[in-house]
């Protein structure tokens, strides 16, 4: 995908749309008396944000139409938490993860993704969003940073 996005973008985005719909449907079907909430590391709108960046205009119009049809009855979260990382930190994480197919991702693409998220958040004030900049934090290796992130979420 990263080497020929124009060729693969629509097929890939449609695949993600179907996969995320299945995941969220499965998660929502498992709510019961003992578990009345879901914590997730993604939201369905992630698909819309990425597709706006990767698809050409005609493809995006079609994708967006299908997206809203598929997700029209899916409940929205009470709170979104966006853990922002600047492009340099994202590139560091990609290098550390070591996946060969990600190593060629250009910083301009990551800039577009960051801008896409922030623009989406700005254009949807009806969503309850908390943005936490973790560019200079390592909550995996550093307990103080982990506790700081939890404090930010709860404040």
Specify the residue positions occupied by each region the protein language model found.
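Short amphipathic alpha-helical segments with coiled-coil-like heptad repeat character
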Residues: 24-26, 69-73, 125-127
